Every structure is written in C-alpha cells, then in structure tokens.
A protein has these predicted regions:
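Conserved GNAT acetyl-CoA-binding A-motif
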Residues: 111-124
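Conserved active-site tyrosine of GNAT-family acetyltransferases
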Residues: 133-134, 139
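Conserved beta-strand in the GNAT
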Residues: 61-63, 69-78, 85, 90
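A conserved beta-turn-beta hairpin within the catalytic core of GNAT-like acetyltransferases
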Residues: 78-87, 96, 114, 151-153
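Conserved acetyl-CoA-binding loop-helix of GNAT-fold acetyltransferases
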Residues: 91, 97-110, 135
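Conserved GNAT-fold acetyl-CoA-binding loop/helix
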Residues: 25-50, 59
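Conserved N-terminal entry element of GNAT/NAT acetyltransferase domains
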Residues: 1-12
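A short, internal acetyl-CoA/4′-phosphopantetheine-binding micro-motif in the GNAT/acyltransferase core
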Residues: 89-96, 122-124
C-alpha cells in the first residue's frame, strides 16, 4: 500500500492539480461517455481551481501526494450552518483502486468533526463515483438536479443528519 499524504493546496499547486484533474476526468469521459475529453468548465486550464478553491473563503483545497508526486485532490466547502459540501474529489487513474479515495474521505471527516452533514453532487453518468460515494463513504442519494453551468443531470448525495 502506498504512503499517501494530504496537504492544503494553494495557488502554486494549481498547475499540478490541473494536470491530475485533467487526466482523471478525461479517463472518466472515455470510460463512461466514449469521449476523449470531459469535465467541468476550467478543469483542464486551471480556471476551475481559481474559481472554486481560491475565490471563496469557505472553500479549502487539498492535494494528495505520494513520493512527492501529486496524485489527486479535493475541495471542501465548510459552511456556517454545518452542512458542508464536497466540491470535487479526483485521483490519477494510475492510483485508483488503491484506497486513496476512502483514505481521503476519512481525513475529511476527521478534519471537520463539527460538520453536521456532508453533501455532494456527481454526474449521473459517473457510475464509479456512485459506487464510491455510496458503498465506500456511506453517502445516500437524495435526488437529482440539472447542473445549470454544465447542462447535465447530477445525482445529489448526503451523509449525516441535517
């Protein structure tokens, strides 16, 4: 098993996080959609992290590192009402199925014990994500909604009590 470490990410980490996010999201697009590229706006040019990690006081980005190499990341939103949000989580396909995601989720829960519940959204077509969040992390699907920015159906999940 690899020795993963988690660090708060900053602006200097955006190029490497963007590289890994691009590889991970494009792999999902090929696997589930038969398309060469696919991800949220700005996922492949750094704009995603500028917009969602740096521009808001409530959001905190993390990088997942093994042997001094960034292999994944995630962004959490810690909100005043205690209903916090997992904005994104991604792992380089070369490191998937090695317990990186579950370890990252355990870290998140341990780091934010004041959280009453966690919410997240993931694309309907992202079957591996559904399994991961439901079976590995204990989330429950609570509905579906259309993502206005991307125009795709998103499954909404929750863990904990509201």
């Amino acid at each position: 098993m690899d020795n993963f470490q988690f660090f708060i990410a900053g602006e200097k980490d955006i190029p490497e996080l963007t590289r890994v996010m691009t590889v991970a999201f494009d792999d999902d697009a090929r696997t589930h959609l038969g398309e060469e590229k696919g991800g949220p706006p700005g996922y492949d040019d750094g704009e995603f992290f500028q917009k969602w990690m740096l521009a808001h006081d409530e959001s905190i980005g993390y990088k997942i590192v093994v042997d001094n190499t960034v292999i994944g990341g995630f962004i959490v939103w810690v909100l005043p009402d205690g209903v916090d949000f997992l904005g994104t989580m991604f792992v380089d396909p070369d490191y998937q199925n090695r317990a990186v995601g579950p370890q990252a989720w355990q870290l998140i829960e341990a780091a934010y014990p004041q959280t009453k519940s966690w919410t997240l959204g993931t694309p309907k077509w992202a079957i591996r994500n559904h399994y991961f969040y439901e079976e590995k992390c204990g989330f429950t699907k609570i509905g579906e909604q259309l993502d206005d920015e991307e125009g795709m159906l998103v499954y909404m999940y929750i863990k904990g009590m509201v």
